[in-house]
Amino acid sequence: MANLTEKSFVRGRLIPILGALIVFIISFSVLYMGENVGLSDNGDFRRVLIMNNIEYKDDTNHYYLFNENYKMLLDNSDSFSGAIVSSWQTNDEEEIYKSPHFMFIKLSKTLNVIANKISGNALSDYNIMYLAILYIFMLSVAAGVIFTFFNESSVKIQITIFLLFIFIFCDAGYLLYFNSFYGEPLQYTALMMLIAFGMLIYKRPSVPKAIGFFTALYFFAGSKLANIPYSLIVALLSVIIVFMRKDRLYRVGIIITAGLCVINIISLYTEIPEWMNRDTTYQAVFLGITKNSKTVEKDLEELGVSKEYAPLAGTHAYMEKDEYPIDITTEEFEKGFYEKVKKTDIAFFYLKHPIRLVGELCHAIENSAYIRPPVVGNSETVPMEFTKKFSGWSKIRVSLRFLYEPWVIFVSFILITLYMIFMNVFYIHNHKIESPARKYMVCALDILILGLWINLVMPIVCNGEADLAKHMFLFTNCVDILFAIGITALVVCPIKRTLAIMCAGALFTGLFYIDLPRKTVTLGRLNGEPLEWEKIRTLEDGTELLVTKECVGFMPYDDESNAWEISDVREWLNTDFLSEFSVADRELIVMTKNRNLLAFNQRERAEGGNHAHYWNFTKSLVYDMGDTAYYNYTEDMVFMPNLMSVKDISVEEDFWVMSPYTANDYMARYMNDDGFILHTDVRNEKGVRAMIRIKR
């Protein structure tokens, strides 16, 4: 009997606790072992820092480097007790917005004050590590609860759950958010706590567990205010918890807890600041509905807006004032646009134009490939550098292209949704004979499937294509959860069926890597070896566009500028690179007039265009609106792929793209080895793929 009790303790308590401890250690190590890593500021930190009385320690550029150290603005930084009290103060002079997220930031401030007192540092010093520790602790607790839920399952299932949690949900793509002031880390950890409490309720329902569940739901809703509609649906569907037990006291407790949760979530909605609603509405219309529309004026009239605002199509809410073709700060625009267009109008517009909605959703799905936001950096020292620490799942999910292939996602979601509709009809029809636990399980799956659809549609309807990759984080998270459920179900299957499904999955994945052989040409020499080129296409004048099959060198783009016309890489390609070409080879090369995009700071050199090119990292959208962006021309014998030609080029390793990152004048675009087009400092080394145009 004693041995049985000891085994029960080990499986029921000790192993889950050890699992949670491993999650904590791994998470902390990913962020702080070796170089400290996190996420740089994309501009969103400002409002969080202001509201919580925190500021940067210096005036250096923080947009592309992860920053660990800040300064707290404390009313009484000389007194320990006064500093503790001041750490919980909110900036009442700046009513930017309110969020439950601030509670965690204030708690991290208190931890910093205590640590500073112990270490002898200035009480006002702020290290974001303490905020990360809070998130790591929440993730570890959620992991421990999830491991506990499976403590009575087979060893095979327990090992599978543990490995999936470590490999997928402790991936750097998720953990990097912990070292930032974004709302996503609270969203992520609150979602994991929500799942954990949901599992506890499934096993042994009680009011305290329900309180934990609905508290996690409240923080999930408040972490990103766009989560509020989904959170309300979750709260209403979670009424199924009431029927898990029959005693009246339990049911009353659940109803009261759920009611308080709904009231608090609704209060979050009522406190959404008007500026946030205005900006997102602007972007949903002008960087969403009308962005690539061929009927802009008709679209605006359908929304109840004057067609005079048609020139604003393709603009966003955070441009310089002189970049707008129409002044959007006037009272006339306030009445003519902001007072007329609501989010419901945008939703109904898409319902009446489902083909256009599907098109936008396809772009959204493609933007869900990365877990970490591809527009911000991870390093403290190298601008726009991505860490490779513990990024196995990030790498694999990009390689598994079906996870962000639009038609695969749509077909899968539709089939799963139809199956869940069938299951709901079945359980409703047989509600008298089915157990509450099984109904609860079906309801939990309903919540997940609804989350997939809602979090696919919400970013487009509520904010257009603005910052789309980052706004797809919750959708990506839900897809990963569904994938983990699928892998777990696969492990449960009989071995023969498991092997058959794995073989079919491998074959299906392989279909995405089928690439027809390209015609190759041998021309010129480099380092004494003949150069092999791939034919891209034949142009209208009969000349052929070629690109080197492999990188011909690895070097910085330039030592300071992202302008192609004055770059070091352009000079090298048109001098040293050609030095081993024979006269006959050179005579085959045709001088090419290239249209080059320009950074915003270089617009005075533009020969055309009326805006800086907007950033995107997918092949389908990377050149979007490039035809109207600032540009000039150069003539080159040898050049590099640009944003228009990258979609036709094979990818084996990173290589520079002949286009700047237009938000500044010291970063350039490059093709990552996974087929996405990113950006980095021009002083970093990347591969070079030469392009030429030759006579046939």
Region locations from a protein language model:
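Hydrophobic transmembrane helix bundles of membrane-integrated enzymes that assemble
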Residues: 2-35, 101-290, 401-495
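Transmembrane signal-anchor helices characteristic of membrane glycosylation enzymes that use polyprenol
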Residues: 12-77, 260-271, 509-510
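Membrane-proximal stem/loop segments at transmembrane-domain junctions that anchor or position
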Residues: 49-93, 273-383
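Short linear, low-complexity motifs centered on an aromatic residue
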Residues: 362-379, 487-497, 552-555
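Small-residue-rich helix-loop
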Residues: 377-398, 404-412, 440
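Sec-dependent N-terminal signal peptides of Gram-positive bacterial secreted proteins and lipoproteins
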Residues: 502-510
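Collagenous Gly-X-Y triple-helix signature in extracellular proteins
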Residues: 514-696
